[in-house]
């Protein structure tokens, strides 16, 4: 290859679409085309962490939760993403790290509302489950076409030299 040639990948990576319907069960991600064992356990850990936080708030601390602003069940919220309305329901996705209030492994949390005042938490919608997003599901957006919601995001990979590969070059 000479210096003035452009090398293109032989195959464009598949675009994955996540259907939104609440917390994702760990069984959904078995098989070679889905998550590895570490990510499967991450799904379980997110569910356990959120259940423990809900139990704590039931007995104490609920009066300190936000009423009009979105607040994750536990951990860290950042970068609202994919704000849209579909079939009369508003959707708000956000970067989410349930294990550390300072950030950490990034996922996408999901809230819905019919009036933009009362929001219902729907769980984690996107987990880092592929080699091209193994260190986090970063910011992106959503768009609607023909009654289908499409989510897209930036996959994060931390390289051995400490740099980040945001565009999978």
Q: Regions from the language model: what does each represent?
A:
Residues 11, 22-25:
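Residue-level detector of intrinsically disordered, flexible termini
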Residues 3-4, 14, 33-34:
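Intrinsic-disorder-associated, low-complexity terminal segments enriched in Asp/Asn/His/Tyr and depleted
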Residues 10-11, 16:
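Basic polycationic patches enriched in arginine
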Residues 25-31, 35-169:
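Beta-rich carbohydrate-recognition and catalytic domains
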Residues 2, 18-19, 26:
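Ala/Thr-enriched low-complexity intrinsically disordered regions
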